[in-house]
Amino acid sequence: MSVSGDDFDDYFDDEIDDVIVPGTSDTVESVQTNNRPAKQSDISISQGNEEDEFQSPDRLSGNAVQFEDVERTSKYNVFIPKCKNVQENIFVTQLTQPPSPPEMIRGPRWKKPGPEPLAPEPATTRVGANHQSDQYHDEDKEMEAAIAASLRSFEEENGGDVPSTASGSTPARTAAAPCAAPKGTAADVPFDLDDIPDDAFDSDLSLSPPRSTSQATRGPPVQSQFRTNRPLGLRQSTLFDMAARNPDISSQRGEQIFSPPEKSEPPTHHKLNEEALNTWVYPTNLGKTRDYQFNIAQRGLFHNLLVALPTGLGKTFIAATIMLNWYRWTKSAQIIFVAPTKPLVAQQISACFQVAGIPRSETTMLTGEAAPGIRAEEWKSKRVFFMTPQTLVNDLKSGIADPKRIVLLVVDEAHRATGGYAYVEVVKFLKRYNKSFRVLALTATPGSTVESVQAIIDDLGIAKVEIRTEQSLDIREYVHARDTEVQTFQNSDEMVLCMELFTRTLQPLVDQLRNLNAYWGRDPMALTAFGLTKARQQWMGSDAGRNANLALKGKVNAIFTVLASLAHAIDLLKYHGITPFYRHLLHFQSNTDGQKGGKYQRQIVQDESFKKLMNHLQPWTKNPDFIGHPKLEYLKQVVLNHFMDRGEGTAANGDQSQSATRIMIFVHFRDSAEEVVRVLKRHEPLIRPHVFVGQSSAKGSEGMDQKTQLSIVQKFKKGTYNTIVATSIGEEGLDIGEVDLIVCYDSSASPIRMLQRMGRTGRKRAGNIVLLLMQGKEEESYIKAKDNYEKMQQMIASGTRFTFHDDKSPRILPPGVRPVAEKRQIDIPVENTQADLPEPRRRARPPKRPPKKFHMPDDVETGFAKASSLTGKVTKKAETKRAVRKPTPEPVEVPALEEVLLTPRQQQDLERRYCHIAGTSPEFIRNPRVDAYPRLQSVPRPTKAVKHGSLTSRMIGTLQKMGKVSVDCESRYRKVLALDSSKEIVDSVLSRDPWPPAKNSGRLGEKTHAFKRPSATPRPNNVHVREDENEDNCTPELVSPEKLMSSFLEPHTERPPYSSQRSQDAFELDFPDVETLLNRSAERHVSRKRNRFVLDDDSDE
C-alpha cells in the first residue's frame, strides 16, 4: 500500500482514535537518514506477499517502511521524535485512561473479550499467507475479538441490537483512508471500521461504567429486581448534545417495581398498622399517571431519598404520596413537612390537602407566631405538621415535641441543608433519640459544587438519589417549553459620564495603594468589595504590612475601608441604574456632615469631580420620566408588550381579577426593586406591580413579615397584582401557574439561584424567560453558572463522585413485608375544602408554657459512673456486715388514772395476799428507802433491756454529791447562817438592785447612766429578790444617800465561805428532806408529759 503526500496530510488530520498508526524503530531510523527533510515522501508499506490492507501492528513491526523521494514539497513538517518508542498493543479489561506524558505516543488500547470463548469463525483462505507463522494468526484473531467485544459492549449500552458474531456473513472491514485495495487480497475481517462509533473506545467512566462481559456473551441477561417496559432503540442525549451511552436506570421510561431493602435491624418502636402494610397507595386524582413520579415515590418509601427534579414537575405530589402511605402504615407516629418560609409552608398544605386526602383535623401548621403553650397542645393531638425548621428546632430542644414519635421528615428546598442551617440541626437531633425515621429531601438544584452536594448527602443521611434533567426521557413530555432570551446592553452616555467623574474621584486613593504595593489594580471602576478585602489581607500578611508602623497601617486600613464602601456603589451604577447609585452616594455624603467621617471620606466628598457628579445626578433623579439604565427601558417595553399581547386590560368590566397572566421580575438589591416598581407604576392599571422582599429591615427599606408576604402572594394569585418585583425571597418554591414571563434584571453567578429563578415559569403552560445582562462580567457570570449547572447535573446522575449512606437509611417495615402498589382515587374529606390554613386559633389568654422536658435516648446508661468503671477494670466491693435490725418503737397512749388504780376488791386482795404475812413475828412492808444501802444507791446498777431513766440518773448524782460532803459540814453551815444583823440592809439593797440593767440597743459601748457603780462593792453574781417583794413591787425602793454611804463606811467583816445573802440571825433555815426535793422535781415535768406519747418505758418512776 502506498500513500501519497496529500493522503499523508489527511492521514494525520484524522483523530488518533479512528485509525491505527503503526510505528517501529526501523521507521524512525529511515526517517532520520532521509537527506531531504523539507520534502514530503510517499509512504510505501511493502511486504513479501500481499495480504490484508491493515494487519496487526506486531506483524508490521518486522517490515521496514520505505520512503521514496518525491520532488513535490509538502506544506507540513514531519515530527521526528528524539526518543525511540515502540508502539505496542495494550489489552485491558476496562477502558481506563492511565496518566501518560503528552510527548510520548503510546500504542492502541484494546478491550479484552469476555471469559467465555467466542463462537468459532468460519475459516477463510488467505492468499499468499503460507510463509507467515501461526503466531501472527493468533494475534490477529485476538485483535479481532477485542474489536468485536468493544462494539458489542457499546451497542448494549445504547440499547441497540447486538450484531451476531456467529453468523457466517460478516461485513468486510475497510481502511479509514480511502484507497483501492490491491488485487488478490481477501477482505475477510468480520467488522468494518466505519461501523465503529467515534467514542467506542472512550474511557470516561462517569458516562459509561464498565459492565460485566458475561452479560454480553451469555445471551439473555439475568432479570434484575425491577422490571421495565423501556422502549428499545432510543438514544438519549446529554445536556451537551452528546450521546448518553449509559442512561441512568432511574431515567428509564416505564414503571418499575422496588422492594424494601433486606436489612438486619431491630424492630421499630412505632406502632404499625399491619392491615395496611401489604399495599401502598398511589393517588390518581390528578389524572394520568406519570412514570417518574410513580418510581420516585416508590423508592422514597423505602430509602432516605434526595429528589432533584426541574421546577414544576410535581415534587409536592411525590411528597404527598409518601406522607399518605406512612400515615396509613403507622397508628400514632407523626409526619413533619418543613419549608424555609411561611408562604412555602402554606403552599404545600393546600397541595397536600387536595392530593393525599389526609384529614384536616389531623393536620396543623406551626410557625413562630404561635405561643409555645398552644404548640404543646398541638403536638399532643395532631399527627401531620407543616412548619418552618426554626420552630421545629425550638420545640425539639424545649421538649415540646417528642423526637421518638417522628417517622417521616420531608425537607423542601434541601439545597439549604449545609453548615449550621436548621435542617441540619433537626436531623442531628432526631438521630440522637430516634433510629427509625425516614428522610425525603426535595430540591430543584442540589448544589453548585461536588462538596456542597456531598454535604447535603452527609447531613441528611441520604441513601439514594433520584435526579432528572429537562432532557430526561421520562419527563420530556411533561416539560413545558421555555424560551430563553438573552439581551445584552452597553453603558449609556449618562453612565459613561458618571463613571468618568467617579474614576477621577477615586483615582488618588487607588494610586496611593498601588505605590504601597497594597493593591495592583489601576482602574477604579474594577473595584469590588471582595477583591479589596483579599488585597488587605494579603498586604497585612506580607513583610511590608507586618513591619509597617502603626500610622502606615492605619492609613492603609482607612483607604481600604472607604474604597470597599464605594465598591457597592460601582456595582449599582454598572448593573442596576443611576438612581440607586445616587442614593448610595447621598448616604455616603451624609456620613461626613459636621465632624463625622474620616480623613479620606471627607477627601472624596470635597473632591471637585465628586461635586460635579452630584450636580449631574440631582436633576436627573428628580425628573419622574428619567430612566437611569438601559435595562429599565427594555424591561418596561417587554412588560408592556407581554400584557398587551395577552389582552390585559381589555375586559369590558375592567375587573382586575380577570388577569390571566403574571410576570415575575427578579433583582438582587432592594434599591433596584424599588426603582423597577417606580418605573412600572407609570403604566397603571395595565401594570400593577408590587415589591416582594424579606423580613429583615435595611437602611431606607422596611422588611416584610411572613404574614405580609403571604398576603402579597395570595393577592398575586388572585390578580390584584399582576407583576411582582422580588429579591431572593421569591426565588424558591413559589408555585404560581399563571406566571408566563420571568425577567432576570441581573445575573447571578450561582447556578442554584439562576435555575430557581427560571423555574418560576413554565409550570402549567409554556413560559418565557428574559435575561438582561451587561456586556462583560455579568454576561460571563451567566455563562459560568449555566455550564456549572450542566456539569453538576451530569456528575450527580452518574453517582461516581459521591458517597451515599445506606447504613443510615433504616427499613422500618417488618422483614418479609413487600407492599404492592395500589392505584386508586383518593376520597378528599369535606373538611379539606376549607380555604383557610389549619393554624391553631389564637386565644385571649394562651396556655402557659409547659416545663422543659428532657427525652432519654434508647439504651442509655442512667445514673452516675465512676472513673474506675470507665477503664473497664472491675473492682470488688468490700463486704459490709449486715446491720442488726432494731425494732421500731411504737407509740403507746398513756391510760387514764381510773384505769390503772386498783378497785376496792383488788385492794383487799392485795392487802390479804401480799401485805399480810402470817407468822409469829410482825412484818412490815414500807416504801423504798434512799438511805438504805448507800453505796449501792450511789452506783448505777447493771441493766439489760430497760435502761435507767433520767430521774434515776439525777438521783444517783445527788447521792454521790452528798457522799462527798465532809463530817464538819454542820459547823461550817452554822457560821454561814449566823450573819450579822447589820448586813441585812446591804443584802436588801443588793437584792433590789437600784441600778437596773441597761437595755441593749444593739450598739456596743453605749452608756446608759451618768455614773458608774462603785468598784469597791462589786455586784454579786447570784442576787435574788424576795418572793413577796418580787411579785407586788416591780419598782425598786429608793434608799437615802446617807444610809447608803453609812453601809459602805462600816468596817468590813470577812464572810465565811458558802454564805447566803438570805440568811439572818433571827431564824434558822429548815432545809427540806430528799423526798420533798424529788417530789418538786417531778412536779415540774408533769405538765410537759401530759400531752406526750411515751416512746419507750425506760423510767424508774
UniProtKB/Swiss-Prot annotation:
Annotated region described as Disordered, given as residue ranges: 22-59, 95-138, 154-231, 250-270, 824-890, 991-1067
Superkingdom of the source species: Eukaryota
Reactions listed under catalytic activity: ATP + H2O = ADP + phosphate + H(+)
KW Lipid metabolism (keyword) present: no
Every Helicase ATP-binding domain range: 296-464
Positions with biased composition (Acidic residues): 191-202
Family that this chain belongs to: Belongs to the DEAD box helicase family. DEAH subfamily. FANCM sub-subfamily.
Protein name listed in UniProt: ATP-dependent DNA helicase mph1
Organism: Aspergillus fumigatus (strain CBS 144.89 / FGSC A1163 / CEA10)
Gene name of the record: mph1
